[in-house]
């Protein structure tokens, strides 16, 4: 029979282990994020902190960031993008670490003139270097209703999903000499800003400021992630996303999205890589 002291000791060990590996579930713009720029152009629109808007005019855009940093996690939010003529605007949802050799995982939505589709720009940076761009046109109008955009980031891969459909997988290819973002904690950021010099048709379409202010909406922000605190990450291998891989169905969905809706893939850009595609593309 195990003694009372033995049971207490075992319970204490389990408790300390669980505390070390505690995950965060965030879901309120009031308590989990800070509108860190925009001079009033970013607004939380309800009392519970479920709905937030970002606006852009000729003088400034706006943005918010999470209070906490994370090293691995599943981060998702629902977004409804700027309607009508959104040329020159960029609406974002991304993870990023500080410093000059930062890591970053991007969802960027490049606006367009009325009647033409948004371009979804995805990228992965490691130690300040990106060049991993894949771009898509969406199979729906992202300005009519909210859709769920999600980043799954674990030690082996980054998966981008839309409404639960995986559209891109960036695998850890360190064995091939390809850096992977796994050492630097990142915050969640979102922003609406102007980039008319490149965002729409390479800068050919300029922002029509008579349509300002431009406004995008965010809601149902959720994080299941490993919090970085005091130089350590409370990362648990018990989360399904921590070991998540794409099964046969998931891989087929990625192929479907890329076959039907991808408009740019760095892996097939022979002008940029005349000596052959980067090793992670094989």
UniProtKB/Swiss-Prot annotation:
Residues 1-26 form the signal peptide. GO terms for cellular component: apoplast. It comes from the Eukaryota. It is found in: Secreted, Cell wall; Secreted, Extracellular space, Apoplast. One of its GO terms (molecular function) is xyloglucan:xyloglucosyl transferase activity. Glycans are attached at residues 112, 238. It is an enzyme of class 2 (transferase). Keywords: Apoplast, Cell wall, Cell wall biogenesis/degradation, Disulfide bond, Glycoprotein, Glycosidase, Hydrolase, Secreted, Signal, Transferase. Root specific. It catalyses: breaks a beta-(1->4) bond in the backbone of a xyloglucan and transfers the xyloglucanyl segment on to O-4 of the non-reducing terminal glucose residue of an acceptor, which can be a xyloglucan or an oligosaccharide of xyloglucan. InterPro entries: Beta-glucanase/XTH (IPR044791), Beta_glucanase (IPR008264), ConA-like_dom_sf (IPR013320), GH16 (IPR000757), GH16_AS (IPR008263), XET_C (IPR010713), XTH (IPR016455). Its EC number is 2.4.1.207. Gene3D superfamilies: 2.60.120.200. Xyloglucan binds at residues 108, 121-123, 131-133, 197-198, 202, 272. Residues 27-218 form the GH16 domain. Disulfide bonds join 226-235, 267-281. The record marks 106 as: Important for catalytic activity. One of its GO terms (biological process) is cell wall organization. Contains at least one intrachain disulfide bond essential for its enzymatic activity. Belongs to the glycosyl hydrolase 16 family. XTH group 2 subfamily. Catalyzes xyloglucan endohydrolysis (XEH). Cleaves and religates xyloglucan polymers, an essential constituent of the primary cell wall, and thereby participates in cell wall construction of growing tissues. Involved in cell proliferation in the tissue reunion process of wounded inflorescence stems. Maybe a downstream target of NAC071 as a consequence of auxin action in wounded stems. This is Xyloglucan endotransglucosylase/hydrolase protein 20. It comes from Arabidopsis thaliana. The gene is XTH20.
């Amino acid at each position: 029979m195990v003694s009372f002291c033995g049971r207490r000791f075992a319970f204490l060990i389990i408790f300390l282990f669980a505390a070390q590996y505690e995950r965060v579930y965030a879901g309120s713009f009031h308590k989990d994020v800070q509108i860190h720029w925009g001079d009033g152009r970013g607004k939380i629109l309800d009392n519970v902190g479920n709905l937030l808007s970002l606006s852009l005019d000729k003088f400034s855009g706006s943005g918010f960031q999470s209070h906490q940093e994370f090293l691995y996690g599943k981060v998702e939010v629902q977004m409804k993008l700027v309607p009508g003529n959104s040329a020159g605007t960029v609406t974002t949802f991304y993870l990023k670490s500080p410093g000059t050799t930062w890591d970053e995982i991007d969802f960027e939505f490049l606006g367009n003139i009325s009647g033409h589709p948004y371009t979804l720009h995805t990228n992965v940076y490691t130690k300040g270097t990106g060049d991993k761009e894949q771009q898509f046109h969406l199979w729906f109008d992202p300005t009519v209703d909210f859709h769920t955009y999600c980043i799954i980031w674990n030690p082996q891969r980054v998966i981008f999903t839309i409404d639960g459909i995986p559209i891109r997988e960036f695998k850890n290819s360190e064995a091939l000499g390809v850096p992977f973002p796994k050492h630097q904690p990142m915050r969640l950021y979102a922003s609406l800003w102007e980039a008319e010099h490149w965002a729409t048709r390479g800068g050919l379409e300029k922002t029509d400021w008579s349509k300002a202010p431009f406004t995008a909406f965010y809601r149902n922000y959720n994080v299941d992630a490993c919090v970085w605190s005091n130089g350590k990450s409370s990362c648990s291998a018990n989360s399904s996303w921590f070991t998540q891989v794409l099964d046969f169905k998931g891989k087929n969905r990625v192929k479907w999205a890329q076959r039907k809706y991808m408009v740019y893939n760095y892996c097939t850009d022979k002008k940029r890589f005349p000596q052959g595609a980067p090793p992670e593309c094989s």
